[in-house]
Amino acid sequence: MKKCAMKKYLIVNGDDFGATRGINRGINQAHRCGILTSTSLLVNTPWSQEAAELSHTSPELSVGLHVHLENGVRKLNSGPSQVRTALDEQLLRFQMFVGQLPTHLDSHHNVHRDPELLPLFLELAQRYGLPLRDHSEVHHFSKFYGQWSEERHLEQISTGSLTRMLETEIEHGITELACHPGYVDPQDTSSYSVEREAELWALCEPRIRHVLAAQSIQLISYHDVPRLLAGAAV
């Protein structure tokens, strides 16, 4: 990435789009009022269609597929064909909701990192030319997260913490900063709840844009990645 490496490009990607109505609202607000440029859509929840409809109102937002595999499928009890079928079905549902292919591919709880599952995810990514998290020219950055060792660490997702990360840990080239903004609501049964609102406030803090400018970090989405990589190859 010769030309690409001359600059710092940052994708801010919100996982779990479609998980709940509160998460949908949070991701939408983080895009409209904050620095979020991309999201990853769950397609097998009651709020998936609502999320897709929200994305249609924000054409600059890149939308990827956030694959969610049930435990039974994840164990490969019926062999790779069961997982392959689940991946194909979720891609088809994504196209039905969004009207186009995803801009990128990742997975809930990063199950694609499982050595048994990874080849099947790579197969899908290669078939459709999709960047797969950890397996593309986009560097994945996961430190903006409010739980470690099953303990809550809101200080890790504060405006100050995000500022320090942007100032010291964003590399030249293309980086995806993963985040999980949202509003707490009764539909969210996960342990990651109030952390979502803390992330949302940090992402929407106006001072963060000044930090990006001071560090010469350019916000992009996955829509921009093919163009940047093509330019870097020249």
Where does each model-flagged region fall?
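Structural preference for beta-strand elements that scaffold enzyme active sites
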Residues: Y9-I11, L36-S40, E60-H66, P102-H104, ...
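Glycine/small-residue-rich loop that forms an oxyanion/phosphate-binding "nest" at active or ligand-binding sites
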Residues: G72-R93
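Acidic (Asp/Glu)-rich catalytic clusters
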Residues: I27-C33, S48-G64, L92-V98, T168-I170
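Boundary/entry segment of secreted carbohydrate-active catalytic domains
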Residues: M6-R21
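C-terminal domain-boundary segment and adjacent tail
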Residues: S190-V234
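Acidic-and-aromatic substrate-binding clefts and catalytic sites of carbohydrate-active enzymes
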Residues: F17-R21, L41-E50, N71-L76, H108-E116, ...
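Catalytic domains of cell-wall/extracellular-matrix polysaccharide-remodeling enzymes
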Residues: L91-I170
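Active-site beta-loop-alpha junctions enriched in small/polar residues
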Residues: D15-F17, L42-N44, H66-G72, H108-N110, ...
